[in-house]
């Protein structure tokens, strides 16, 4: 995931801009990406199938589904468009 942050250095800040103020992600010291950010980093890379994300991160499909749903519920933008906006992070379409 370090390489991901080299490709998308503002990912965490841009992801937080999509969330309501009280729900923004706060990383622990020395933490680059937490579980939620790892899931959405993979989505940003185009891996949107929860089964594939679960296999890659070694979580259950239910866990991935729950993280995705919780993030959509914390969105400052339209819930149904949230993942579309995640896909635009770091692109010229922003």
Name the predicted role of every residue range.
Residues 2-94:
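Cytosolic nucleotide-binding catalytic cores of signal-transduction proteins
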């Amino acid at each position: 995931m370090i390489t991901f942050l080299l490709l998308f250095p503002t990912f965490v800040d841009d992801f937080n801009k999509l969330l309501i103020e009280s729900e923004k992600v706060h990383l622990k010291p020395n933490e680059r990406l937490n579980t939620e950010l790892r899931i959405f980093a993979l989505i940003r890379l185009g891996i949107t199938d929860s089964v594939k994300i679960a296999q890659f991160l070694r979580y259950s499909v239910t866990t991935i589904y729950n993280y995705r749903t919780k993030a959509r519920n914390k969105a400052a933008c339209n819930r149904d468009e949230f993942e579309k906006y995640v896909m635009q992070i770091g692109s010229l379409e922003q």
